[in-house]
Amino acid sequence: MSWQSFVDESLLGTSQVARASIHGLDGKRYASSAGFVVLPSEAQAILNGITKDPSPFYAKGIAINRTKYVFVRSDPGHAIYCRNGNEGAVAVKTNKCLLIGGYSEGMQAGCCSSVIEKLADYFIANGY
């Protein structure tokens, strides 16, 4: 299965995730949904917040797809959660990649997070 197939089928195909992307740990984009362009610098900042120190997110927020999100919480070393009005996003780090998924107004944050986290668990179990 290709990286794009994971985005299209495993994430967007659930109807619980409105937009998604998968990046390498260097910030390079492997695949993304149409119009959801997370810059390598944004992915790298998210990775730094997950693996090192999320405190800059408290004051500055988190930039994803050139949109500023309010930092909600983190699971150190694993994930961050953020929102922008009635929308939000979750980013989960695996051994070799970063999954970013967003939900839109009318979608449930917990359902979106669960889908992203389950795919991350699958990647981790398979060495990614």
Predicted feature residues:
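Non-catalytic interaction/Regulatory regions outside core domains
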Residues: 1-128
